[in-house]
């Protein structure tokens, strides 16, 4: 599936949010790129909604067509559409690998999943958008444990907090999905209601 592969820092500056996490280039210049980047622009309601949608898309590495499908599914579900949307995004396999601390960024997590390094309930899954469910068990393949990305993951495990809906067993680099996340457990700088308003027009 096509995805954005351009400079993430530029997107972070455009949307005024660190899409990577710990992006020093963004921290030095947290304003839009270009010669008028520091200029104050009057932001319309539509622009705010669009920016929030783009923030979510680029944070999770999802293209527009797929993101709209997530919104439509969230809208069909019971409960708040915004909460449902974030839950669908958070339970992507690549995001779970990132949240568990087995990858430094979501982009790296997506690559690790695509290369077939993970098993879900004993079955190889190489689709980053695969949706995990409550009680799923995610393992790193035995042959992959000795590769550099997972050696680094083992050494750095614990540097980033793991959300309460997940548990990581460090000895085996196993991820346990205890539940689907609630909104309070999703630590992303998003106003999801603006995304709902954007698509509701």
UniProtKB/Swiss-Prot annotation:
CDD domains found in the cross-reference section: S4
SMART domains listed in its UniProt record: Ribosomal_S4 (SM01390), S4 (SM00363)
Gene3D superfamilies: Ribosomal Protein S4 Delta 41, Chain A, domain 1, RNA-binding S4 domain
GO MF terms, alphabetically ordered: rRNA binding; structural constituent of ribosome
Residue span, S4 RNA-binding domain: 91-155
Keyword presence, ATP-binding: no
One Pfam family cited in the UniProt record for this chain: Ribosomal_S4
GO CC annotations on file: small ribosomal subunit
SUPFAM superfamilies: Alpha-L RNA-binding motif
Coiled-coil features, chain-numbered ranges: none
Keywords, sorted A to Z: Ribonucleoprotein, Ribosomal protein, RNA-binding, rRNA-binding
GO biological process: ribosomal small subunit biogenesis; translation
Database matches in InterPro entries: Ribosomal_uS4, Ribosomal_uS4_bac-type, Ribosomal_uS4_CS, Ribosomal_uS4_N, S4_RNA-bd, S4_RNA-bd_sf
Entry function: One of the primary rRNA binding proteins, it binds directly to 16S rRNA where it nucleates assembly of the body of the 30S subunit.
NCBIfam families: PRK05327.1, rpsD_bact
Family (UniProt): Belongs to the universal ribosomal protein uS4 family.
Quaternary structure and partners: Part of the 30S ribosomal subunit. Contacts protein S5. The interaction surface between S4 and S5 is involved in control of translational fidelity.
Name of the protein this chain belongs to: Small ribosomal subunit protein uS4
